[in-house]
Amino acid sequence: MYKRQDGDGLVSQYNMTLVEELGLLKMDFLGLRTLTVINDAAKHIERTKGIKINIDEIDYNDPKTLDHISTGNTNGIFQLESAGMQSFMKQLRPKSLEDVIAGISLYRPGPMEFIPKYIKGKNEPESISYACSELESILEPTYGCIVYQEQVMQIVQKLAGYTMGQADNIRRAMSKKKQYVIDEEREYFVYGNKERNIKGCVANGIDEAVANGIYDSMVDFAKYAFNKSHAAAYACLLYTSPSPRD
């Protein structure tokens, strides 16, 4: 550790991975112009129209705002500016903040392959299916699709008997693309590991081929997936963006 010459900040020579392993808290702070734009818009409305807007009290299930997002006319709105995302929102037609959160999580390289299945499940609930019955309680809120990192953790806990800590380790290995860990954990997920007290899917009555298929889906998904809290923070921010305009 050393102190910066241009201020009071402390700098570590360790990279972010080692800092976390040493037990230090690592936080990422985003400096977003969107926050300034929203604040300036709220001040302008108060100054010109005498209407004071409390951003913290916005109705996150306001139908007018959701309809606006569904039009795809979202230039200048955080996370919704790309043509691909605008097209996706027109297809998704979100009816709640939960839909917006899922939309942000899905529009990424890994989860993106689930978009057609998600939209079909949303519009045609009878089309939803699960690789095994144990997945239903985990994936029902997202129409049978894996959408969040937390769902990966729930799956390995419920199907294979991982502890919460072990589940977080496998989530992290997948998101960091640590292939040697991913390959090792596949065997534990399917067949278990006595030393780590992991029972495994097969011992829990889940077919070996089904278990491997579920693991493949988790690996493909988790490489680029968000955790839900991350997506929720983004969704609240983008949801706020059109509100002052309306």
Task: Report each predicted region and the residues it spans.
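Mg2+-dependent phosphoryl-transfer active-site scaffold
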Residues: 3-225, 233-241
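Pyridoxal 5′-phosphate
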Residues: 230
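A short, hydrophobic C-terminal helix/tail in secreted or cell-surface proteins
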Residues: 242-246
